[in-house]
């Protein structure tokens, strides 16, 4: 709520329509109805999202009466596959994530002062130190992770209590859902992101690596924010 009231129309939210992202969409819709402030929401469409993921986007838009921007990379999937001889996420996964996610993110954030993301600290070791309110130096923007200290159980309890729409692939064993060529269901006792980039040791797309610096770590303040805002 603080972020919405503080930044207003200068706040945006990124979502890949994971369970956590759906929770934030629902929360922002509730806050919109309470405050009259609508938050921009966008999705980075790599061209390889599951059909079920795209169907969920439409369902969320209808349920919460809120349109969600689609941001696409400059190179189409067909052009990338013709150039590489197959899906780029299989041929050059790191470059693919950079070209189809990291670069488009810069366009999506243009004109905004802060953005919200649905990452949790307990998802991967790389995310354990994520502050609730930090700074993304690559895009010179405040980065807010409202669910940073939530657990998977917290997320699904909220979903059940508020009847939040989610991806039907979760019912088929997909814990974390990314691009269809490199995402598989997870097995019992596997890490929830074990199904991403299946067959490799890749764990992150790059959107959240080195992009969460505590406000306290900056040499200059960001819109008056202080070190206190990073404490949880």
Give the label of every model feature segment.
Residues 1-232:
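Nucleotide-activated chemistry modules centered on ATP-dependent adenylation/adenylyltransferase
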């Amino acid at each position: 709520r603080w972020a919405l009231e503080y930044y207003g129309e200068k706040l945006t939210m990124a979502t890949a329509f994971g369970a956590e992202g759906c929770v934030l969409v629902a929360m922002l819709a509730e806050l919109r109805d309470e405050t009259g402030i609508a938050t921009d929401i966008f999705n980075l469409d790599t061209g390889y999202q599951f059909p079920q993921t795209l169907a969920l986007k439409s369902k969320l838009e209808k349920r919460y009466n809120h349109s969600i921007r689609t941001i696409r990379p400059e190179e189409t999937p067909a052009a990338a596959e013709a150039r590489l001889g197959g899906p780029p996420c299989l041929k050059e996964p790191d470059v693919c994530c950079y070209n189809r996610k990291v670069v488009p993110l810069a366009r999506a954030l243009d004109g905004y002062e802060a953005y919200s993301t649905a990452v949790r600290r307990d998802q991967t070791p790389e995310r354990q130190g994520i502050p609730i309110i930090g700074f993304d130096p690559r895009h010179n923007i405040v980065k807010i992770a409202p669910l940073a200290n939530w657990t998977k159980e917290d997320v699904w309890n909220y979903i059940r209590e508020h009847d939040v729409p989610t991806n039907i692939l979760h019912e088929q064993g997909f814990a974390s859902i990314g691009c269809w060529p490199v995402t598989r269901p997870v097995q019992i006792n596997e890490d929830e992101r074990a199904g991403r980039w299946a067959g490799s040791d890749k764990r992150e797309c790059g959107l959240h690596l080195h992009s969460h610096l505590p406000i306290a770590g900056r040499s200059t303040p960001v819109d008056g924010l202080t070190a206190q805002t990073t404490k949880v």
